[in-house]
Amino acid sequence: IARNISWETKSDTPTEFGVNIRTPKDFSEVNGYEMKYYKTDKLGLLPKAVLELKNLRNEYKVKMKESESKSEYVKWNNNQLAVKRLMASFYGIVAYQGFGWADVDLAASITASAREAIRIAAFKVREL
């Protein structure tokens, strides 16, 4: 969501939402750059869908916590877990070549931005 990664937001012009798809999978130095950029003017379809699902999941979690019976709790918990899995599957469908809208750049950008976030957090923990 943070990088606005989506089919229609891809940009050949550098923007503030750049992703280095060569971000290492470990703690080694960044060795080279291959940037993919995404437009910042309008929220893309993919992040918009994820945000809507995230809001729906949060609604289900509130209902789950407010449940007055075990069966109601289980129902809302199952609903929020289903939405969680649906959100997580978006990367898989974008990366799957059998999907009509598969896009290697989007899949690479999603995984690279996740690696970058994990690396930043890990480096901060090391500093403690």
What label would you give each PLM region?
Residues 1-128:
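Conserved acidic
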